[in-house]
Regions:
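N-terminal low-complexity or simple alpha-helical regulatory segments
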Residues: 2-91
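Amphipathic, soluble alpha/beta structural segments
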Residues: 37, 112-121, 198-208
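Amphipathic interaction/junction segments at domain boundaries or subunit interfaces
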Residues: 53-166, 190
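Short terminal or interdomain "cap/linker" segment that borders an active site or interface and mediates
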Residues: 2-13, 17-18, 127-168, 176-209
Length: 209
């Protein structure tokens, strides 16, 4: 019988982006330590190819983020995951966006709330189209809600609190780019790992600065 952890995947390109981003933040030795702890030594010096094949399993993604917390503690692991998420956007997710017409010019004339909503919707479409991750956007009380209904970051994990910090970092950097350099508060309010139905990230549409 097929394990449920093997049913859903990121494309190789996104797996590669995650590992390259980890290396940028932690150094190669840090990445190798995480891969060894996660029993993923086959990926050492052997990152996935830069293609769209769906071969980088959700369980692998979840394992990597969990090992960050095991190696560096909950607080240290959270900080690293946020930085890795920001790097993921700059190292490749932004390129997906450009392919979909998500350029600064496309958003320049929109007022900020419309710009954020259009950008968030387009990035949700990116994940829904190219990966097995499922994202839904909602607006409530002036805030944008980014619902991850099938989440690789906490796949098969159990926790007392939200753990999808990499997604928070990625969205923070995406919003920074979309808005032309403004900083927004992004907070994960619910998490499947904590028993909730979705991993929901709440985005304040008013920038901090």
């Amino acid at each position: 019988m097929t394990s449920p952890t093997a049913l859903y995947y990121y494309p190789n390109r996104m797996g590669r982006i995650i590992l390259i981003s980890m290396e940028e933040v932690m150094g190669r030795n840090g990445v190798n330590a995480v891969l060894n702890l996660a029993s993923l030594s086959s990926l050492i010096e052997n990152y996935p190819p830069d293609n769209s094949g769906l071969n980088f399993s959700f369980s692998t993604v979840s394992n990597l983020t969990e090992m960050l917390e095991q190696l560096y503690g909950p607080h240290g692991g959270r900080g690293l995951a946020l930085r890795i998420g920001r790097a993921c956007f700059n190292y490749g997710v932004r390129q997906y966006g450009v392919q979909m017409g998500l350029t600064e010019m496309a958003f320049r004339l929109l007022p900020l709330p419309a710009k954020l909503h259009a950008g968030a919707s387009a990035f949700a479409e990116l994940f829904n189209k190219f990966t097995d991750q499922m994202v839904r956007i909602e607006e409530e009380n002036g805030k944008l809600l980014w619902h991850i209904e099938r989440c690789p970051l906490c796949w098969d994990r159990h926790s007392h609190e939200p753990v999808c910090h990499l997604a928070v970092g990625l969205l923070q950097e995406a919003l920074f780019w979309l808005s032309g350099g403004k900083v927004f508060n992004v907070e994960e309010k619910t998490c499947i790992a904590a028993g909730d139905e979705t991993c929901t990230l709440v985005i304040d549409q008013t920038p901090i600065f």
